[in-house]
C-alpha cells in the first residue's frame, strides 16, 4: 500500500513539475546514465535550493533517487515530511548547522551507502550550499569519502560510478520557465580503488577535480564575479542577438546555454585583452539595466517596431479573450498568489535565501493550493451542475490555468509596448537609452567578432 501511495504521489508531483510549474523540461544525454542496478552517485551543481533536488528526482524515469539537501530546510515539519517522501535526505554542514550536528551525517551517509550497494541512485551537491548565481563554487570532498568507504565495506567488489550532472534554468524564480538537466560520461571509481588503499586523499583530490571539471564543462559558470551583474545582463539582452547570429533559436534553452557559454568566454578574453574598454562597457550596460528596471521595461521592447494598427489588433484579441480569462481565473488567481507571503519573505532576505522562492512556490502549490482549490471546483460543479460537466471542467483546469498565465503575460507585454511606443516619441530619456543600447550592441559586435 505504501509503495502504491509513493508511486501515485510521485507521479502527481511529476505532472505538477513538468507540466504546470515548468514550460519545458530538457533532460540531455540520458544515455550516460548507468544501467539500472549499478550503484550510481550523482554529483550536481547547486543553484536553485529546492528546485534542484526536484529537477534531479524527475530526471531518472521511474527510478528512485535518494538526494542530499541542506539540513536546515528540514526544520519545518511539513516540509521535512514532503522532502522525506521524495527520498530527499538531510546533509549537515558545520558552518551552518554547527559542529555538533555533523554526527548525524554518519547515520544518513550510512543509509545512503546501503542504497548504493543495493544498486540504487544517490544524488548530492558537492558545493554543500546553493549559489545565488550562475557560478560553480568550491567542492567538498565528503561525497567521495562516502563513496569510497561504501565500496570498502564490500571489499571493493562493487563498482560505484560518479555521474557528473549540470542543472540550468532560464529563470530561477518564475513559473512556466525552462529547466535543463544534462549528464556527463560517468566516472568509474573502480579504476581508483588500488591507489585509494594507500593514498585516499590523493584519490579524493583527483576525482573531485575531475568531477568538478566535468560539471563546469556542461554548465554556465560566470567566473568573473566582480562583473557578474553586467555579464549576466549582457547575456540576457545582447546574448539573444548573439545567439541569432550563431543561427540558434534563443528560446531553446539547450542551444541558448551553448551560446551563453561561448559569449561569456569571449567576454573574459576581452577583459584580459582590453580591461579599460570592457570596464567602460560593463558600466554602461549596468546603467542601461538600471533604466530598464526603473521603467519596468523588458529588453525586447527596444527591438519591436510596433505600429498603431498592431496595437489595436492586440487590444482586440485581449478584449475577445477577456471572458475566457475571467472564467479561467477561478480558481487560479488564488493558486498563483497563495505562496506570495512566503516567497516575499525569502526575497527580502536576499542572497542565497532568495533561491528558495521557486521551491516554496512549488511546494505550496503542489501540496496545498492546487489540490484544495481543484477539489473545491469539482465539488461546486457537482453541486450546481452534473457529474459529467464537473469531470470535464476538472480535466480542463490545467489548460485553463496555463491560458490564464499566458493571457496575463500577454497583457503585461501589451501594456509595456503601449508605454514604450508612447514614450519613445515624446521622451528624450527613452530616445537616449534606445540609442545607447544600439551603440553598446554595435560595440560588442565589433569586439566579439573582430
Regions found by a protein language model. Give the residues of each.
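Long, charge-rich alpha-helical interaction segments
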Residues: 209-301
Amino acid at each position: 500500500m505504501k509503495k502504491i501511495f509513493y508511486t501515485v504521489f510521485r507521479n502527481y508531483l511529476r505532472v505538477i513539475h513538468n507540466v504546470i510549474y515548468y514550460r519545458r523540461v530538457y533532460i540531455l544525454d540520458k544515455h550516460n546514465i548507468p544501467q539500472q542496478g549499478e550503484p550510481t552517485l550523482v554529483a550536481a551543481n547547486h543553484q536553485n535550493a529546492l528546485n534542484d533536488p526536484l529537477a534531479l528526482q524527475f530526471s531518472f524515469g521511474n527510478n528512485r533517487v535518494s538526494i542530499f539537501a541542506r539540513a536546515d530546510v528540514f526544520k519545518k515539519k511539513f516540509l521535512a515530511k514532503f522532502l522525506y517522501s521524495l527520498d530527499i535526505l538531510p546533509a549537515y554542514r558545520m558552518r551552518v548547522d554547527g559542529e555538533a550536528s555533523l554526527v548525524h551525517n554518519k547515520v544518513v551517509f550510512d543509509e545512503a551507502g546501503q542504497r548504493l550497494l543495493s544498486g540504487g541512485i544517490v544524488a548530492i551537491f558537492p558545493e554543500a550550499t546553493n549559489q545565488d548565481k550562475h557560478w560553480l563554487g568550491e567542492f567538498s570532498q565528503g561525497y567521495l569519502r562516502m563513496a569510497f568507504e561504501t565500496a570498502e565495506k564490500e571489499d571493493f567488489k562493487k563498482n560505484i560510478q560518479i555521474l557528473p550532472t549540470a542543472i540550468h534554468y532560464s529563470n530561477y524564480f518564475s513559473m512556466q520557465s525552462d529547466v535543463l538537466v544534462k549528464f556527463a560520461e560517468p566516472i568509474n571509481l573502480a579504476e581508483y580503488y588500488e591507489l585509494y588503499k594507500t593514498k585516499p586523499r590523493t584519490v579524493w583530490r583527483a576525482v573531485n577535480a575531475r568531477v568538478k571539471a566535468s560539471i563546469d564543462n556542461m554548465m554556465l559558470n560566470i567566473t568573473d564575479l566582480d562583473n557578474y551583474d553586467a555579464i549576466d545582463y549582457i547575456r540576457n539582452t545582447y546574448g539573444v542577438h548573439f545567439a541569432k547570429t550563431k543561427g540558434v533559436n534563443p528560446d531553446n534553452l539547450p542551444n541558448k546555454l551553448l551560446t551563453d557559454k561561448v559569449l561569456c568566454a569571449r567576454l573574459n578574453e576581452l577583459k584580459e585583452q582590453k580591461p579599460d574598454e570592457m570596464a567602460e562597457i560593463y558600466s554602461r550596460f549596468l546603467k542601461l539595466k538600471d533604466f530598464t528596471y526603473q521603467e519596468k521595461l523588458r529588453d525586447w521592447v527596444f527591438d519591436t517596431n510596433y505600429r498603431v494598427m498592431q496595437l489595436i489588433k492586440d487590444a482586440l484579441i485581449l478584449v475577445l479573450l477577456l471572458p475566457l480569462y475571467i472564467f479561467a481565473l477561478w480558481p487560479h488567481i488564488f493558486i498563483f498568489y497563495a505562496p506570495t507571503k512566503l516567497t516575499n519573505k525569502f526575497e527580502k532576505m536576499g542572497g542565497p535565501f532568495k533561491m528558495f522562492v521557486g521551491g516554496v512556490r512549488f511546494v505550496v502549490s503542489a501540496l496545498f493550493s492546487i489540490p484544495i482549490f481543484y477539489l473545491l471546483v469539482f465539488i461546486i460543479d457537482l453541486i450546481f451542475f452534473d457529474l459529467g460537466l464537473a469531470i470535464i471542467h476538472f480535466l480542463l483546469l490545467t489548460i485553463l490555468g496555463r491560458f490564464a498565465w499566458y493571457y496575463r503575460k500577454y497583457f503585461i507585454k501589451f501594456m509595456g509596448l503601449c508605454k514604450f511606443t508612447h514614450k519613445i516619441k515624446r521622451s528624450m530619456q527613452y530616445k537616449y537609452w534606445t540609442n545607447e543600447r544600439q551603440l553598446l550592441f554595435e560595440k560588442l559586435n565589433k569586439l566579439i567578432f573582430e
